[in-house]
Amino acid sequence: MGTKKNILLGTISIIHSNWLPYAVGCLISHCKSIDQVNQRYHFHEPIYKHKPVTEYHTVLANTDILGLTCYVWNQSYNDELAAYYKSINPAGIVVYGGPQVPENQLAKISYDDKRSWLDTSIAGLGEIAFSEWLLDLPFSNSTLTTMPTPYTDGVFDSILATGEKFKVSFETNRGCPYSCAFCDWGGQSRSKLTKFNVDDVYSTIAKIYDYKNIVELEILDANFGILKQDIDIVQAMIDNQNLKDNYLRISYSGIAKNGSKNLPVILEKIFDNIPIDQRNLKISFQTHTPEVLANINRSNIDNSRLAPLILEYKNKNIPTTSEMIIALPGETAHSWLRTLDYNFHTLGIDYVRTYFLHLVANIDMATPEYQQQHGIQTKTIAIGHQQFEIIHRCNSYNQDELVRMFDYHWFYHTLVNTNLIKNNINNIYKDTLRFFAQLDDMPVLKSLVERNRSLVRNIFSDEPVTTLTNKHHQRFFSASMRTDDIVVILENQIAVAEELSAFVQQPLEVEWLSDNPLSADATIT
């Protein structure tokens, strides 16, 4: 047997430098379970930090194969890193995987051909396909049935031993039975729900809770709570938390989409046992517009099941947050305002968190057929190393309609989400329209609205690529969907209070915050 080849795998996080690289950790864990791979290859410690590519020079110079997990947010950086690797190691091999690699064969050829430094890319679920590629075996398109266990296999031991604070993630199952048009969690290769051995899940949880420098744990399941075993998994986290006196922040990528009889039990355990600052009922709706839900192949939790759940947690003073996507195909300014109104009055949602619609590879919405059907025109937003494809026109909206849609969002996000006039609102729909009809009488707030309109027009302009360099504009697009509006309001408290008092037709009683928050969840009172 000759000298082993060195493999360097990386899942680079652009914004968060302390997320352990779970995706490539799974590849390493799976590959190390195969004797033939161990005989031929050695794996370097996986990389995960976003830093100047030259700082990876030493390890790259000693690498035969560089494998990178590609997402929409790190594709540009991965390209820079891979090109640099080829410049210092021309004989080295670059392989890409991850959600950004197209599964459509023609799109994949185009993706590969644009990158002269790329030797191969592997689409779809990665562990089995990557090991087959390493062993020169034909791709079997097999589905992984055994849970990768990078934590208990020691893949991350050397990284965790540094003592830095880390956020970690893992799956208890894989796949999604739904196929929402905007999401790549479902689809042909990922629509089957694979349940992993629960003992492996328990061992992983126990290992994670052994580390006091792990501060946050995210469950990556698309529909946590869909399986009965999820109740026991939550209990295992609670037991480890109490046994080891290690109170991690717990988050979930996705809660069971259409409700589940297991969900109330799971939420009860979470809310009764996790520290108070971590308690929040988060529900993903995207929209409440029936035509739009049909366009995106999605159905929301039935209100008859949802309303009692929300009421139960309101009675326990547990806030509810709804997650929405603005400007889905079929949405209009009017329908979006109706959606906000429904959240507030019918469901009693405490906070509405809204996201931009990004198009990624391997979703229905990115296919030519879907885009032709809905009259979709796309463009690119560039922020540093990150590039995002967005829709800037479709059958239901043009730029002017988008400006009105974002006007209504601005009103809700700036004045209602912040608690500024939440208690003075009688009817979200009517009060929003009345606010903009009276906007000329509110000079400070009008200046913020006009500034917001200008930014929205810039983002959704017809130019093929718009680069955002202003930090507030970047935050608006990629994080909070607001600039520094809250800061400006706090700096002009007296004038804003007078303007809003006239609008709500009663004195505005506000206990202003002493600092100037910029976060997406910032409140004023």
Regions found by a protein language model. Name each.
Residues 20-24, 78-79, 195, 230-234, ...:
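Conserved strand-to-helix beginnings and helix N-cap segments that scaffold or border functional pockets
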Residues 2-12, 36-41, 50, 58-64, ...:
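Radical SAM enzyme core and accessory elements
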Residues 107-109, 134-135, 230-231, 265, ...:
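Short aromatic-enriched loop/helix-cap "lid" or pocket-rim segments at secondary-structure transitions
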Residues 151-315, 326:
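Radical SAM [4Fe-4S] cluster-binding motif and immediate context
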Residues 31, 84-88, 237, 313, ...:
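Hydrophobic positions in alpha-helices of CheY-like receiver
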Residues 65-67, 202, 208-220, 244-251, ...:
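Conserved C-terminal portion of the radical SAM core fold
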Residues 111-116, 138-140, 236, 339-340, ...:
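Short, hinge-like loop/turn segments at secondary-structure boundaries
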Residues 2-211:
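Acidic, low-complexity intrinsically disordered segments
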